[in-house]
Design a protein with these regions (language model features):
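Transmembrane helical cores of multi-pass secondary ion antiporters/exchangers
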Residues: 1-405
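Cytosolic regulatory regions of ion transport systems
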Residues: 329-330, 354-376, 380-607
Length: 607
């Protein structure tokens, strides 16, 4: 794999393959990305003709790789900032503040001490390692949160911490490097002020400029994503030129400022950046993991493993405990927070930059004889923490009652009389449901049936603040076909296109009167199962029934009993897995499964 084109194509293909396999196997994508990265590194192993270097090093030289990594990280941090809303922290803002200040100090001190005791590095290198390992980062936190999907409050705290702590850790590492390695301790305060002034000032300034350009419609729609991306990358590069490592502060502030202003919409930009983030994370993890040689990690020995264990079992729990002391978080939330702090790309990038700087300019200092271990130790921490948290986060969240194993709950957009019996039938099977309707009478009836409900529009800003823990699909079942279509479009990025459903239009007509397939959800139940027809059936006495299918009473027997007018709505498997009937999917209920259907009353049954 000596050809750069072949190598880069393989990295891209393996990255997307890892993401897809992780989705299919319901595993954290980071685990597979690391595995594929090590596989690439093994395939591109040492070549005698390269004087100890790997083929990966030959294709992506240090001078080329680190700027690419830095720019990719800047885009990821910018996208992360765009997802941060101040309203998410209305009841937990103090916890975040303590996590990124007091918690960061505890992590810095204890991680540095652990590196000194277990790995045997000198105190300067240990202090620098402690500063680098403060960061967690959206490159690992975001995929894990998407995999676990914990309750909204603790999820928001973890997401905010993962993004805000990155520039803090990078800045602290710069200060430590200048003070303890370069020997410019008298300039630390000035360096810090310079980074903050440049980072915050430039971030807010670029955000203001973008808002003004967008507000005046000086940027055409087709250039929105490109302009935002160029602005973020340009601001990052300019900040770093003025003050070293101020770029991460700039892009984070830029993203947060744009996300919380009320003048222009940025949702379409966020969607583009999310797609770009998946691509960048996939490629970065594989490329950086491919550069690591197992011999470097093995040389750390048991001391390296003890260091990783100390970070997971001692350092993070103590930092979380101190930061959440007497806070509004429950003990279960604190416990989950204490066992989720994986390190990612930012830690790898920062450690690589400082190791290169030390080896290039300060390698003759005896006090820094262990500096070459910074990168290998950081990657050991990345592998160890990602593996541990990747495997343990989801089971722990479910054990603590902060997440569910299978996000197959249903969000009902609409609470008409025929909808509520269906919602109740699903809710009785311990599957989460939420009924949302602007008609208070429908909401009141849902509450009388014991169903979680909310009087709101399903496409309102209010829904962005609603905890959708356990919810994994949308049923848009209002009388308004256009609203159903809008809801399907709104929730497709959240649940996936395969999990957004809506009722068929009142008249299915090919051509200009039908909404395009890519702009709507999957049609529920059947092509003629419109809202008016279902409502009429219920008004005439039809009922939603659950019936167990057995070998003695097959689905064919069920259809014979209730007739051809039966509308199959869904099937519950033995493991409580719910499959919904659609116009293009023919369900075949088997013995042991439960049928949910709208049936007409038989003779002698009450309406």
């Amino acid at each position: 794999m000596r050809e750069p084109l072949v190598f880069l194509s393989a990295v891209l293909g393996l990255g997307i393959a890892a993401q897809w396999l992780a989705w299919r196997l319901r595993l954290p994508s980071i685990l597979l990305l690391l595995a594929f990265g090590f596989l690439v590194g093994w395939l591109c192993g040492d070549d005698p003709s390269l004087a100890g270097k790997t083929i990966t090093d030959e294709i992506l030289t240090t001078d080329l790789l680190f700027p690419i990594v830095a720019l990719a990280v800047s885009v990821i941090m910018f996208e992360g900032g765009l997802t941060l809303r101040f309203r998410d922290l209305e009841d937990s803002g103090s916890v975040l503040l303590r996590l990124v200040t007091l918690g960061a100090l505890v992590t810095w001190g204890l991680a540095g001490l652990a590196a000194y005791l277990f790995v045997g590095v000198d105190y300067r290198t240990a202090t620098l390692i402690g500063a680098i390992l403060i960061v967690t980062g959206p490159t690992v936190i975001t995929p894990l949160l998407r995999h676990v999907r914990p309750h909204r409050r603790i999820g928001s705290v973890i997401k905010w911490e993962g993004i805000v702590i990155d520039p803090i850790g990078a800045v602290l590492a710069v200060l430590v490097f200048d003070a303890m390695v370069v020997g410019k301790s008298d300039e630390v305060v000035w360096v810090l002020l310079k980074i903050l002034l440049v980072g915050i000032g430039l971030g807010l300034g670029v955000a203001f400029a973008l808002v003004q350009l967008m507000r005046r419609y000086w940027i055409p729609d087709f250039l929105h994503n490109s302009v935002f991306l160029a602005a973020a990358v340009g601001a990052f590069a300019l900040s770093n030129q003025i003050a070293h490592e101020a770029g991460l502060v700039t892009v984070t502030i830029l993203g947060i400022a744009l996300a919380n202003q009320k003048t222009i919409p940025v949702n379409h930009v966020v969607e583009f950046k999310e797609n770009l983030r998946v691509l960048l994370i996939s490629c970065l993890f594989i490329v950086l993991a491919a550069r690591i040689q197992f011999t470097d990690i093995v040389e750390l020995g048991w001391g390296g493993l003890a260091f990783v264990a100390a970070l997971i079992l001692v350092v993070r729990p103590l930092a979380a405990l101190v930061s959440t002391w007497r806070s509004e978080l429950t003990w279960n939330e604190r416990c989950f927070l204490a066992f989720l702090a994986p390190r990612g790309i930012v830690a790898a990038a920062v450690s690589s930059v400082f190791a290169l700087e030390i080896s290039s300019h300060y390698g003759d200092l005896a006090e820094l004889k262990n500096a070459d271990q910074i990168v290998s130790l950081t990657f050991l921490v990345i592998v160890g923490t990602v593996t541990f948290y990747g495997l343990a986060a989801a089971p722990l969240a479910r054990f603590l009652g902060l997440a569910v194993k299978n996000h197959q709950g249903v969000l009902f957009a609409g609470g008409s009389p025929w909808v509520l019996p269906l919602a109740k039938a699903i809710y009785e099977e311990d599957i989460p449901v939420l009924v949302v309707d602007t008609n208070f009478r429908h909401v009141s009836e849902a509450r009388m049936l014991g169903l979680p409900s909310s009087c709101a529009s399903v496409v309102s800003d209010y829904m962005e603040e609603t905890d959708l823990g356990g919810i994994g699909r949308l049923l848009a079942v209002t009388p308004n076909d256009d609203l159903n279509t809008l809801a399907a479009m709104e929730y497709a990025p959240l649940f996936g296109r395969g999990e957004v459903y809506q009722l068929p239009f009142r008249e299915i007509v090919a051509g200009r009167r039908e909404t395009s397939a890519h702009n709507r959800g999957r049609y529920l139940f059947g092509q003629d199962a419109t809202h008016s027809k279902l409502s009429f059936r219920v008004a005439m006495g039809a009922q939603v029934k659950k019936t167990k299918i057995t070998k003695e009473f097959t689905y064919e027997d069920f259809l014979k009993l209730y007739g051809d007018t039966t509308v199959l709505m869904g099937v519950l498997a033995d493991n409580k897995q719910l499959s919904l009937a659609t116009a293009n999917t023919e369900l075949q209920p088997k013995p042991g499964q439960t049928v949910i259907a709208l049936v007409d009353p038989r003779d002698g049954e009450a309406n």
